[in-house]
């Protein structure tokens, strides 16, 4: 992850809006969970949605300003301000790890340690989303430092001895789906991962 805290980027993350695709994903994959970890929780954007679906919600992020904002949502039982690779020494295991738009911020050398730590923390499911680098929006944020193809990342995830992962599309964001001329594109983006601007890697525990 980039060294230090970029305060302009922090401000941008504080201004982010809820993505309905993520709320629907939480409703589907977190519902009924005893506990969930919001990995790279940022400002707590999805804390309330996680709280509606899980009995216990904890978060971890490395940015102190974002952690304070997440705490202010009141959705989390606990927030830890630390790199995600330290989750094992900071928090108890959870049923589900929700990891939305985090991995792209890690350099290649940080990816496996972070994944190992998060997988060790999850007893049942890993719910990971990342931008599809075939789309321009994935390149607009200078902190998106991980270079990956969708197939390469799936293979990297499936090096795990704990989880088996599948790659799934999420479709277009709501503000694009409302445009009539995007409807055929959304139909493709909901069926085929390579056509989806954001993709899901869903991990089920196997060992």
Where in this protein do the model-derived segments appear?
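Conserved N-terminal segment of class I S-adenosyl-L-methionine
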Residues: 1-92, 96-98, 109-116, 169-171, ...
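A short glycine-rich, Lys/Arg-flanked "PGG" loop and its adjoining helix->strand segment in the class I
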Residues: 112-126
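Acidic carboxylate diad motif detector
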Residues: 128-130
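A SAM-dependent methyltransferase catalytic signature shared across enzymes that methylate proteins
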Residues: 154-172
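A C-terminal cap/extension of S-adenosyl-L-methionine-dependent methyltransferases
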Residues: 166-207
């Amino acid at each position: 992850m980039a060294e230090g805290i970029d305060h302009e980027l922090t401000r941008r993350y504080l201004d982010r809006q809820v993505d309905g695709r993520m709320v629907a994903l939480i409703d589907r994959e977190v519902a009924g969970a005893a506990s969930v970890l919001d990995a790279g929780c940022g400002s707590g954007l999805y804390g309330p949605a996680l709280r509606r679906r899980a009995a216990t919600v904890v978060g971890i992020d490395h940015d102190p300003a974002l952690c304070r904002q997440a705490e202010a949502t009141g959705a989390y039982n606990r927030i830890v301000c630390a790199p995600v690779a330290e989750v094992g020494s900071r928090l108890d295991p959870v049923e589900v790890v929700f990891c939305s738009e985090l991995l792209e911020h890690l350099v290649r050398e940080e990816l496996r340690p972070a994944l190992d730590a998060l997988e060790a923390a999850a007893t049942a499911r890993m719910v990971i989303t990342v931008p599809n680098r075939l789309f321009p929006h994935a390149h607009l944020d200078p902190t998106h430092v991980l270079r990956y193809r969708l197939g390469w990342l799936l293979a990297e995830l499936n090096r795990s001895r704990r989880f088996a992962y599948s790659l799934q599309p999420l479709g277009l964001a709501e503000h694009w789906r409302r445009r009539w001329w995007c409807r055929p594109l959304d139909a493709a983006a909901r069926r085929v991962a390579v056509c989806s601007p954001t993709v899901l890697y869903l991990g089920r525990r196997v060992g």
